[in-house]
Amino acid sequence: MIRQCLGGWLLALSCVGNAMAAGPDCSRSFTLALHDHGLLYSVDTDSGIDKDFADELIRRSGCQIRVSLMSRARIWKLIESGGLDFSLSGIANDERNEYADFAWYFSNKYYLLVRKDAGIHRLADFEHNDQFQLGVIRSFRYSDSANRLVDKLSAANRVSQAGGLEPLYQALILRRIQGMIIEPFDYPAIDEKKIRDVTTIVEFDDPAVRHGLIMSKKALSPAEREKWRALVNEMRADGTVRRIFEKYFKPDLADSMVDFKTQP
């Protein structure tokens, strides 16, 4: 009897040890930065999708993670240098893949928000009028067609950069820019009458772009990045990510954003 109890106790300890080994190494504290961007995170309310996601990531990992607020441009610089462990809702490109790894948890499309009085009905209308200025957030990248538009207009000095959404909305209202690139997280601000009444949306003919937990390759080993990716995948599999998105979007839109293939 004693031998059976001892065997069961050792098995339990073994299971606990394996579970701890499978999770992230919490022997040090980590850093994670949010950025102020619509429904992803609002500094005014200290709430948003990425805030909820970060809270759940901290709870599940059991690690100490210091959360701060930064501009997107600073986030990418610190991720590259290893001065920041994590950020959220990031998208990949060839340059970023050199220094960052990603754990995907949603995807969304991008749209061109333009002034009605500019007479823009398709992308070519914007691209071919030298008087039109495009507003973007510094260090943001978008879908393929949107990126091509930004790069082409940047080369012609037709892009105005800002640190966040609010300055771009103001520039659009004041006719300093004729368009800006948006995503579903920006919808509440666009629904405000002063913006809705003067704008319309032009679609990019692009598929949805995956967004994920950003992990610094310099700060985190490949093995540890896989452990954090496994946590994110668990949050997707058990419906946690979906429940977070349904707090902020109608179910059909939430479904379209969280249902995607993890592999290209």
Regions found by a protein language model. Name each.
Residues 64, 141-157, 232-264:
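Ligand-binding clefts/hinges and TM-proximal coupling segments of bilobed small-molecule sensing domains
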Residues 34-37, 108-109, 193-232, 251-264:
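Periplasmic-binding protein-like
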Residues 55, 64-128, 139-142, 201-206:
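Acidic, polar ligand-binding/catalytic clefts
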Residues 28-43, 124-142:
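Short loop->beta-strand "edge-of-pocket" segments that line small-molecule binding or catalytic clefts
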Residues 54-63, 104-105, 127-130, 139-162, ...:
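Ligand-binding cleft/hinge of the Venus flytrap
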Residues 68-69, 73-85, 125-127, 165-186, ...:
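Short helices/loops that flank or line small-molecule/ion binding pockets
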Residues 22-91, 95-98, 161, 238, ...:
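Extracytoplasmic small-molecule ligand-binding "clamshell" domains
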Residues 51-60, 124-133, 140, 214-252:
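Extended ligand-binding regions for polar small-molecule ligands
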